[in-house]
Amino acid sequence: MPKPSIRGSELPQRQSPRLRTSLLSTSSDPHHLSRPITDRSPKLGLDRRSPRSGGPHTDPLSQKKLGSRISGLESQLGQAQEELRLLKQQLAKAEAAKKRAQEELHRKKSKKPNTPAPERDDIPGDGHQETDVFEVLDEKAKESEKTKNDELASKEDQINVLKARLYDLEKERVSLSEENETLKDQLKKTDTEMSCAKAKEDEIASKVSQIGEELEESNETTAKLKKKLESVEEAKETLEAEMKKLKVQTEQWRKAADAAAAVLSGGVEMNGRFSEQCGSMEKHFAGRFVGSPGMADDSDDGSGKRKSSGKKMFGDLWKKKGQK
């Protein structure tokens, strides 16, 4: 009869090794479950404000900083994804441990102790002893159930904490992904702007080179025109000197012509006076010299000599003016 009592006293002390191992594996590192996210990922708390774009003339230093910022964000994103994966694994383990604990508790509840029926021939003391054994078994079962409930509640709390952290990490990952995409877009935009700026710079350099060539051609043309202008100035000075000479010669010719005209006009007057004298003499000596051929010849010879002497004088004056 003491044999079943001993078996009954050992019954509540048995525990599933799988449950104990799972509980130890999930609760062996409480600091790992309760420490904040920033301890495991110190870079997640950094300032994630996107840098302002620099415009069409972006400095290469700012582009380098933008590239380093993107690489830093990518490393943070990878770290956050790794922590998210670890938390998911922990959550799966905790839920599995919770499920195993619930199954064990359900199995304990459904499993009733096989109590032997008291025999009629037993003595009254043995019945009292069996009643004590059942009470002890009941108390131990209640304690075991309470322990299981406490463990389940603890697992529930741990699962809730893990879910909250999982949610925070998911939000952090989404934020980092969005910022990473934004920075990548900014980097692409900066690259495009730099390409456009480089193309414009090349175009301006080509225009400057073309303008330089045109300027050289213009300088050469200016030098040629300057030489032509100098030659024209020299020709002009030469022509002006010749014009002055011609003007002086013309003035001399005019004076000579005036002198010749004066001489000619003086000879005409003298010829007129002589003809008047001759006419008066003819009137005076009309009866005596009429029809005399000698007088007619003398008058003709005198006027011809005067004319030839006037022409000779004009020629001499003309030669003298020309020599001057």
Curated annotation (Swiss-Prot):
Per UniProt, which keywords does this protein have?
Coiled coil
- Kindly state the subunit structure of this protein: Interacts with ARAC11 in vitro.
In its UniProt entry, what is this protein called?
Answer: Interactor of constitutive active ROPs 4
Q: Which family does it belong to?
A: Belongs to the ICR family.
Provide ranges: composition bias, Basic and acidic residues. Answer: 29-50, 95-106, 118-156, 313-324
What does the record give as the function of this protein? Acts as a scaffold, mediating interaction of ROPs with different proteins.
Which InterPro entries does the UniProt record give?
ICR (IPR029688)
Q: Where is the composition biased (Low complexity)?
A: 13-28
Recorded coiled-coil stretches: 62-266
Q: Where is this region: Disordered?
A: 1-74, 91-156, 175-201, 289-324
The species is Arabidopsis thaliana (Mouse-ear cress)
Its taxonomic placement starts with:
Eukaryota, Viridiplantae, Streptophyta, Embryophyta, Tracheophyta
